[in-house]
């Protein structure tokens, strides 16, 4: 358990990004997202890897080529297209929850943190106001905020209807 906790912390706070998992993924399921650093940001490096669940076929390339013996397809923060995909997985990650009104709405966030790797638990649902308040303290929630605000193209139409 100590190893998993250290690796989760290392990946999210590491001062360097090798990006090997991004380079070797044949489906482009691992991408590097620029994130703010310093100040109130929970990140120490300007790039974070996000794993996109819908694009991954779990070929294992990212794990095979990882110089840190990681398994990015299981360990990196994962963007799920809907709540049921997140609930069926054990990966740390999140899904945006919209009502039928959809676009323009401030979504709730369904999130499973890296700590779930140690003791898998069900995801936690946070209302928009609640999860927005945690963007400076929780790396996964901060990453979700970056995707929502700066990379909405990663959110499929299915995401907007979940």
Residue spans for each PLM region:
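Ferredoxin-type iron-sulfur electron-transfer modules and their immediate structural context
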Residues: 1-55, 99
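Flanking helices and flexible, charged tails adjoining ferredoxin-like Fe-S electron-transfer domains
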Residues: 43-55, 61-161
